[in-house]
């Protein structure tokens, strides 16, 4: 797995490009020099943690042939 993160040259915005050919923008809070145009890097870290957890739970339940009506992970940091 790999990822490249580049500063866009504007404020505190960064472009991340993943090894699976996806891209996303990250930005900082205005008080930190950002423009609040995209999620903060730490918010994406939290979202990734929740996404990995939900992914694993759903995958395990599907492998066990359980009926799944939903899955929601709430995180706070």
Predicted regions and their residues:
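Extended beta-strand/beta-hairpin segments
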Residues: 1-47, 58-77
